[in-house]
């Protein structure tokens, strides 16, 4: 490696400091909510045989045509770094014999995703997702549970007020086939007005044109045929059941007939939570039903639904002050009290308190660093405190001090420590 090359690969980022605190907070919330809804954690490898994704994402999808990291290993196998979770989770579900287990199964995953995209704010070539999947999910209650769950994640992160829920229903396979024919006929009339990407999709997958972010394409969507015109009675009834249940739970939503999601495996309900910032709608969290994907990969008919959210996108919307936990500092006047202070720090950590212990012997230097560490309290042990089994506690926000017995420390913190 040449000199000066010890830096990040373009599109990657190191996580440390406030960033890693935000990251871990989001993962902790995602895990806790998964547990509350009886999801089991499942981790898949970060690379799969390329066929896992190529068979299922759609050959003309942006992910496959522009964004995947694909390589050949020494055994001449083509492998792909994971560009999304669902196909990998379905592969694991089939490979590990889950088809023969209980009818309804729920899986939670998180980890890195890789897409060779143009790096920009909130979008890197390696980023992270939280991901939830339900297999055997035939009931419309599963659809609504996923939306409620997604909304709860945003609420726990205090960003639900920034999110707009959009839903659509893609119907069954026949609905999509009929709709694709009509869309192709409509957009062919405006071929010269379409972007190059949409012209390419016109022959292969006209539904994907509706996923375009090009303003020139979007202007044509207004008068385009709507998928509801091609619903079967079952699809129409299913959408009504879903919206009735959303209304029952007072969940606000917008029905967006142009919402199709970017991957071919979706059918039935699709949804997105978007952030309408400066007139540009950015997707925060998205998902939908994919009732045909398991059958496509295994021959077994298993209904399924899932959603995912980009952790870095959530981090951009989350305030650091909401999650920053403040440590308690343990300080000592001289080296004679260092062991006593070290024992207090050990005691606090064993009781799940965040504790900073300074190894520097200079007391003035210890106290000078407290402001940098954003400590709420400083516990100070001098010669008198060590002899009398007492602690001097200084509230660094208020600048006041008090003396307590060692045995009263937990009681004091339970009443005064803001992280409780």
Regions found by a protein language model. Give the residues of each.
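TRNA-recognition modules of translation machinery and tRNA-sensing kinases, especially anticodon-binding
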Residues: 1-420
